[in-house]
């Protein structure tokens, strides 16, 4: 069952401080280049709202995951499905939030798309922020250049490339300690070696680390701690890049990104013993404790090979990218509350039913994604005064993706329990809805889902330079997609063996129109209008069991599950400015937007049955603005600030999302979209000390948001919160030493209370972390 869990709270807002350090080192007039429009250009020339954070800034700010990034980028938020943890998260930009259907934010590792559908069993792939040149966050729909699922925007990881001219390297060691947890560490090293001067170079990077857990597991009967820090996480990363420069015009760069991430459990605690667990039902637990019956570990492995061919044709630059994206994500959930408890409640013998209700049950999920893609694009040379007023980019894209989800849910010991009681587990008079073979090998449910997707598209943009300081852009992408879906199911909750095959297809066009005006050398204004689009898909079949029917009735929904859900789309209207004022001492970027979203893909959760399905529910709009500013007060003092507002609301009643016990709709016109903080603000300062030292401090406030659309849910309103961090350090020759504190006040506030697999859980801010970093370059 998919649950929406806002998890952006896990991070500190140091990133802007680290950017200040970079600016101080490089000078106030530093030019920031980005590839937002698939060509390298000055960010001021891009008529989009873009945040670019350098690799050095990411390292200085200890940004290593989506949660950390969300804390420092205006109008970027972060949620998770089925519990908080790596591989479960999804991103939202400008209030375009949906845990159903395809992702609303496209994620790219260089030119390789890591974007896949949202599933109850997994979230977006999350590469570590390691050996990157920069990270770019492109706000607003990017469908013209980045295709379907760039509905709210795009996140790009830009890797550092092999250096053909000189050997270089770097190393870093970080150790820290987390309150209520233990020791954390991160070790990494990168080396670049020219194998042949100016023609062939190899770049290798490795990283290994651990974050300590903070949650203790207690015995459900004695309430004594049996395991400490169960939610620890470990990771290993390997990056390889080989660049061959054949001549001045042509080069080939094969690359590989490999990551293995293992977690001992999700970051969920309980406030009280669940009502299914023991005679201690309702007993209060201490903060950061859980009484779960079954541990919930996970293992997420990513492999991203690619080969990029670049050629200078004289009149234009050719880029061809052949890539793969392979992911295997295995995880376990505690299914006792939705499997054992329900089965026990429909056993006619109350003594046996009570025993069955306490049997441990696991939801064993295995996810596989295998994608191959190819993109070929041709980009004209940059604009030069006195030459052609037109610049352009055109390309083709093709991808084939196979996604498989295997779900096995055993109730351990159920056959033995019936046998010991002298009962027949296949008899519907002794167990409601039973049939022969319903619990083979103790499994209560099995499902195998296979999605085979194919997508082709052509795209292009033309920029007409009306004058030296006025530009107009027109772009269009035309997309065609097909899907073959097959699902196999069996055992008790599936109603016996079943098989479903659904074929579907879709097409879309996503235009873009933009106007950019350089008022003077310091300020540029822009207008951008763009369309975003998401593909639809088949729903996983949901058996109409007694519990499913009861949930549908209680929610005021029809007694049927839709076979599929349709595409959705939006139009975005944005105006903004980018300024360098006070002689370059003040950098100020401001943008305002209005988004109209229709036919929204949304998730409908059946709370007691343990199933969910996707459907299209209506319309929404998101209105807001964002800004970021950097002021270099003196050579030694820099101030930074950023903020955003996103008023994302449904613009019509949503009967498809059900009603409460009194018949009132769960979601009505004007209700806020889930998982979107209305306000977000950060403020930071960096002070240089002498020639080699620095002190940084930053703070962030995240506003309240809506968790569950069910009004009487404990997670309906998620409170706002404030966090702060500090760091100090110094440089000696090629060495840098830093001490830091994240969550300075040790704020352990409960920021959400979602229901996960039928259990009410709580999520805390990660406690204070104190650490030190040593790094060097050579």
Show the residue positions of the predicted features:
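N-terminal periplasmic accessory domains that precede
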Residues: 66-69, 90-94, 104, 108-110, ...
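Gram-negative outer-membrane beta-barrel transporters
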Residues: 379-381, 392-395, 468, 587, ...
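Transmembrane beta-barrel wall of Gram-negative outer-membrane proteins
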Residues: 168-170, 179-266, 370, 374, ...
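Short acidic/polar hinge/loop motifs at secondary-structure boundaries
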Residues: 112-139, 189
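C-terminal beta-signal and adjacent terminal beta-strands/loops
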Residues: 639, 700-710, 729-778
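Extracytoplasmic beta-strand/coil segments of soluble accessory domains associated
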Residues: 35, 67, 71-112, 133
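Membrane-embedded beta-barrel scaffold of Gram-negative outer-membrane proteins
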Residues: 188, 306-313, 317-335, 518, ...
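Structural signature of Gram-negative outer-membrane beta-barrels, strongest in the C-terminal barrel
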Residues: 243-247, 378-381, 391-399, 449-595, ...
């Amino acid at each position: 069952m998919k649950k929406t869990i806002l998890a952006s709270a896990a991070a500190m807002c140091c990133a802007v401080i680290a950017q200040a350090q970079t600016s101080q080192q490089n000078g106030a007039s530093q030019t920031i280049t980005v590839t937002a429009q698939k060509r390298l250009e000055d960010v001021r020339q891009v008529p989009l709202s873009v945040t670019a954070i350098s690799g050095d800034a990411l390292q200085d700010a200890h940004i290593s995951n989506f949660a950390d990034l969300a804390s420092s980028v205006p109008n970027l938020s972060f949620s998770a499905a089925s519990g908080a943890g790596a591989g479960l998260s999804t991103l939202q930009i400008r209030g375009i939030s949906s845990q159903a259907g395809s992702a609303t934010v496209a994620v790219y590792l260089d030119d390789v798309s890591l974007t896949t559908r949202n599933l109850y069993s997994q979230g977006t792939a999350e590469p570590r922020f390691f050996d990157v040149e920069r990270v770019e966050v492109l706000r607003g729909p990017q469908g013209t250049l980045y295709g379907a699922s760039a509905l709210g925007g795009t996140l790009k990881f830009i890797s550092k490339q092999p250096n053909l001219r000189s050997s270089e390297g770097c190393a870093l060691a970080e150790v820290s300690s987390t309150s209520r947890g233990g020791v954390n560490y991160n070790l990494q090293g990168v080396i670049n070696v020219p194998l042949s001067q100016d023609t062939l170079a190899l770049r290798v990077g490795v990283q290994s680390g651990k974050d300590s857990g903070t949650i203790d597991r207690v015995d459900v009967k004695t309430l004594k701690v049996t395991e400490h820090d169960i939610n620890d996480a470990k990771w290993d990363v390997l990056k390889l890049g080989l660049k061959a420069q054949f001549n001045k015009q042509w080069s080939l760069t094969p690359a590989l990104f490999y990551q293995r991430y293992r977690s001992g459990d999700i970051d969920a605690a309980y406030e009280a013993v669940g009502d299914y667990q023991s005679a201690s039902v309702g007993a209060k637990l201490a903060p950061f404790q859980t009484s779960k019956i079954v541990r919930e570990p996970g293992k997420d492995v990513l492999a991203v090979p690619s080969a990029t061919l670049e050629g200078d044709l004289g009149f234009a630059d050719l880029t061809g990218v052949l890539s793969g994206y392979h992911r295997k994500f295995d995880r376990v959930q505690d299914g006792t509350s939705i499997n054992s408890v329900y089965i026990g409640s429909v056993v006619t013998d109350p003594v046996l039913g009570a025993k069955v209700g306490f049997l441990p049950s696991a939801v064993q999920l295995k996810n596989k994604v295998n994608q191959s893609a190819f993109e070929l694009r041709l980009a004209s040379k940059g604009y030069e005064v006195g030459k052609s007023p037109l610049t352009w980019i055109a390309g083709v894209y093709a991808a084939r993706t196979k996604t498989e989800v295997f779900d096995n849910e055993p109730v351990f010991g159920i056959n033995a329990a019936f046998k010991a009681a002298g009962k027949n587990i296949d008899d519907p008079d002794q167990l409601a809805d039973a049939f022969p073979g319903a619990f083979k090998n103790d499994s209560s449910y099995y499902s195998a889902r296979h999605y085979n997707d194919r997508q082709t598209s052509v795209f292009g943009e033309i920029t007409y330079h009306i004058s030296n300081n006025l530009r107009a852009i027109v772009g269009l992408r035309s997309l065609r997609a097909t899907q073959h879906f097959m699902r196999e199911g069996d055992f008790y909750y599936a109603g016996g063996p079943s098989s479903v095959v659904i074929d579907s297809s879709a097409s879309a066009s996503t235009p873009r129109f933009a106007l950019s005006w350089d008022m003077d050398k310091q300020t540029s204004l822009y207008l951008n209008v763009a369309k975003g689009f998401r593909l639809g898909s088949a729903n996983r079949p949901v058996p109409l069991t007694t519990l499913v029917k009861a949930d549908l009735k209680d929610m005021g929904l029809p007694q049927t599950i839709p076979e599929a859900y349709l595409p959705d789309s939006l139009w975005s209207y944005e105006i903004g400015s980018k300024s360098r004022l006070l002689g370059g001492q003040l950098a100020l970027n401001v943008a305002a937007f209005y988004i109209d979203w229709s036919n929204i893909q949304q998730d409908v959760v059946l709370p007691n049955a343990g199933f969910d399905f996707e459907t299209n529910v209506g319309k929404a709009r998101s209105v807001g603005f964002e800004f970021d500013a950097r002021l270099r007060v003196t050579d030694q003092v820099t101030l930074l600030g950023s903020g955003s507002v996103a008023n994302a609301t449904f613009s019509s009643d949503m009967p498809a999302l059900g009603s409460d016990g009194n018949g009132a709709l769960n979601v009505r016109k004007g209700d806020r979209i889930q998982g979107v903080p209305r306000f977000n603000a950060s403020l930071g300062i960096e002070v240089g000390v002498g020639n080699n030292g620095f002190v940084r401090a930053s703070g962030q406030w995240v506003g309240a948001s809506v968790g569950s659309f069910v009004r009487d849910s404990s997670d309906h309103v998620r409170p706002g919160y404030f966090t702060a961090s500090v760091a100090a350090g110094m440089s000696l020759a090629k060495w840098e030493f830093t001490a830091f504190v994240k969550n300075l006040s040790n704020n352990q506030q409960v920021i959400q209370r979602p229901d996960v697999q039928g259990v009410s859980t709580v999520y805390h801010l990660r406690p204070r972390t104190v650490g030190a970093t040593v790094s060097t370059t050579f």
